[in-house]
UniProtKB/Swiss-Prot annotation:
<dbReference type="GO" id="GO:0005634">
    <property type="term" value="C:nucleus"/>
</dbReference>
<dbReference type="GO" id="GO:0003700">
    <property type="term" value="F:DNA-binding transcription factor activity"/>
</dbReference>
<keyword id="KW-0804">Transcription</keyword>
<dbReference type="GO" id="GO:0043565">
    <property type="term" value="F:sequence-specific DNA binding"/>
</dbReference>
<feature type="region of interest" description="Leucine-zipper">
    <location>
        <begin position="134"/>
        <end position="162"/>
    </location>
</feature>
<dbReference type="InterPro" id="IPR000047">
    <property type="entry name" value="HTH_motif"/>
</dbReference>
<dbReference type="InterPro" id="IPR001356">
    <property type="entry name" value="HD"/>
</dbReference>
<dbReference type="GO" id="GO:0010434">
    <property type="term" value="P:bract formation"/>
</dbReference>
<keyword id="KW-0805">Transcription regulation</keyword>
<dbReference type="GO" id="GO:0048510">
    <property type="term" value="P:regulation of timing of transition from vegetative to reproductive phase"/>
</dbReference>
<dbReference type="InterPro" id="IPR045224">
    <property type="entry name" value="HDZip_class_I_plant"/>
</dbReference>
<keyword id="KW-0238">DNA-binding</keyword>
<keyword id="KW-0371">Homeobox</keyword>
<dbReference type="GO" id="GO:0045893">
    <property type="term" value="P:positive regulation of DNA-templated transcription"/>
</dbReference>
<comment type="function">
    <text>Putative transcription factor.</text>
</comment>
<protein>
    <recommendedName>
        <fullName>Putative homeobox-leucine zipper protein ATHB-51</fullName>
    </recommendedName>
</protein>
<dbReference type="GO" id="GO:0009965">
    <property type="term" value="P:leaf morphogenesis"/>
</dbReference>
Length: 235
């Protein structure tokens, strides 16, 4: 279909041309004046639509109505769990945290719930259970860490004390090897020098031996003592 550009432009010009002013110059005539831009022209706004008209299938309309329901359409609401149902599900979860197909069907029949709803509840309950287990594990590890930290601090303090003792002993050994030791008291400080002292017991023994020998030698040289001791006395 061929379109005439010239004819369309002329139609638009004609459509938007202002009409002639009325003969009456009264101001009231303007209120009763009706302007029709499409007067005398076959051009209408509906003629601007080009291309084929796309019709939406009924199936898509139904899906859109289900996804985006309006006030007139009632959506199937999720059934809430009662306290008895929650207690039964909790007991079943405490017995076994994993849900198999047979137990799911059995619970759905007993509680009157959909199997999908039971599966979702078990999935959420397992997630909460795992989070609780992680919290408990964190608390226990935190307590163990605090105990180990305190023990480490105690060992560190003990090592510092032992190092101080070793340092003092090293200083004492150095002073002993140098020959002087300073002993600090409450009132004064005494300096002791290392002096080599001879054993007096050995000197005493040597002196006694020499003295005894002199006594024997003196008795042997004294004739009075020899005579008196060797010959008997006569009356």
């Amino acid at each position: 279909m061929e379109w005439s550009t010239t004819s369309n432009v002329e139609n638009v010009r004609v459509a938007f041309m202002p009409p002639p002013w009325p003969e009456s110059s009264s101001f009231n005539s303007l209120h009763s004046f009706n302007f029709d831009p499409y007067a005398g022209n076959s051009y209408t706004p509906g003629d601007t639509q080009t291309g084929p008209v796309i019709s939406v299938p009924e199936s898509e309309k139904i899906m859109n109505a289900y996804r985006f329901p309006n006030n007139n359409n009632e959506m199937i609401k999720k059934k809430r769990l009662t306290s008895g149902q929650l207690a039964s599900l909790e007991r079943s979860f405490q017995e076994e945290i994993k849900l198999d197909s047979d137990r799911k069907v059995k619970l759905s029949r007993e509680l009157g719930l959909q199997p999908r709803q039971i599966a979702v509840w078990f999935q959420n309950r397992r997630a909460r259970w795992k989070a609780k287990q992680l919290e408990q594990l964190y608390d226990s590890l935190r307590q163990e860490y605090d105990v180990v930290s305190r023990e480490k601090q105690m060992l560190h303090d003990e090592v510092k004390k032992l190092r101080a003792l070793l340092r003092d002993q090293g200083l004492i050994k150095k002073q002993i090897s140098a020959g002087t030791i300073k002993v600090s008291g409450e009132e004064d400080t005494v300096e002791i020098s290392s002096v080599v002292v001879a054993h007096p017991r050995t000197e005493n023994m040597n002196a006694n031996q020499i003295t005894g020998g002199n006594q024997v030698y003196g008795q042997y040289n004294n004739p009075m003592l020899v005579a008196s001791s060797g010959w008997p006395s006569y009356p």
